């Protein structure tokens, strides 16, 4: 059985230019790199320090660990360091690039796409891949066929169909479909409302709500339906009205199948089913 030195294959630095001779490391720790032929030293140093070999010779040392470990080559005169892959001999100027390269040999893919589970060896490749999901709409609502890019967006949308409002304000009891909407609402209790109506004194936390309310005093109705000429002060009511002309009823009751043009009408309707259920429970 041979010694460790005999078992370990020689690690070669990449050749630089014509006539350069390969250098080798004997595998021992803190070993000095020696040329197979004496005149090859200038070619090695040209690769380490630039395109032109220095006039004076420098010592270049190599630190080697166990078999398969990367080797560190350094020049004491310039403090320049190169990290070499023990598998293929390719060199890198920092350990981060070396580790990324070594995943080619190990097959390691630590970066996983949260949407489809596909794995990648580089984080940049994963980011590039995830943009595909942002451009596609894979998640379709079975109720109204509207599509979404993210599963979480579909879940939020489906709560509108079901009339579910799982996020409840612990101060006033008002419920919301999204936690972010609840957070915005909750600030209205903690912060003084900056928008106060000079007509009735009612206060509002945002300018859009204040504007809708203020139009009830002024009588302004800026949203006009081109089909029938009816006007509205609130854009959401205007949008719901337009759906009546188009025959759209995207809000469907999952209990009886009835459709509605407004989510508020669906919620009001579903309460009738809850009342029926209460009567059955007590019968």
Curated annotation (Swiss-Prot):
| Highest taxon of the lineage | Eukaryota
Compositionally skewed regions (Basic and acidic residues) per UniProt: 1-41
Indicate yes or no for the key word Zinc-finger: yes
Write the signal peptide boundaries.
Answer: none
Start and end residues of each stretch annotated as Disordered: 1-68
Q: Which GO terms describe its cellular component?
A: nucleus
* InterPro entries (alphabetical): Zinc_finger (IPR050331), Znf_C2H2_sf (IPR036236), Znf_C2H2_type (IPR013087)
Q: Answer yes or no on keyword Nucleus.
A: yes
SUPFAM superfamilies in alphabetical order: beta-beta-alpha zinc fingers
Modified positions (Phosphoserine) are 43
Provide the function of this protein: May be involved in transcriptional regulation.
The record's comment on protein family reads:
Belongs to the krueppel C2H2-type zinc-finger protein family.
Protein name (record):
Zinc finger protein 691
Tell me the organism. Mus musculus (Mouse)
């Amino acid at each position: 059985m041979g010694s460790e030195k005999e078992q370990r294959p020689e690690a070669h630095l990449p050749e630089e230019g014509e006539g350069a001779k390969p250098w080798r490391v004997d595998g021992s720790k803190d070993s000095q790199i020696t040329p197979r032929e004496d005149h090859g030293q200038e070619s090695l140093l040209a690769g380490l320090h630039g395109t032109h070999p220095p006039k004076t010779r420098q010592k270049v040392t190599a630190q080697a660990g166990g078999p398969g470990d990367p080797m560190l080559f350094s020049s004491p005169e310039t403090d320049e360091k190169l990290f070499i892959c023990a598998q293929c001999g390719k060199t890198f100027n920092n350990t981060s690039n070396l580790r990324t390269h070594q995943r080619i040999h190990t097959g390691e893919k630590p970066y996983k796409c949260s949407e489809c589970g596909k794995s990648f060896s580089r984080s940049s490749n994963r980011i590039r891949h995830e943009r595909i999901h942002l451009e596609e709409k894979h998640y379709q609502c079975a109720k109204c066929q509207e599509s979404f890019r993210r599963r979480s967006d579909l879940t939020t949308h489906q709560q509108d169909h079901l009339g579910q409002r799982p996020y409840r304000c612990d101060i006033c009891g008002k419920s919301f479909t999204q936690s972010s909407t609840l957070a915005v609402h909750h600030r209205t209790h903690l912060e003084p409302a900056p928008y106060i109506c000079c007509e009735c004194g009612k206060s509002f936390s945002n300018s859009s709500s204040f504007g809708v309310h203020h139009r009830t005093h002024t009588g302004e109705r800026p949203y006009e339906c081109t089909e029938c000429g009816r006007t509205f002060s609130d854009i959401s009511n205007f949008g719901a009205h337009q759906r009546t002309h188009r025959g759209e009823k995207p809000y469907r009751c999952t209990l009886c199948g009835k459709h509605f043009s407004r989510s508020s009408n669906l919620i009001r309707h579903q309460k009738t089913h809850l009342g029926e259920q209460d009567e059955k429970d007590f019968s």
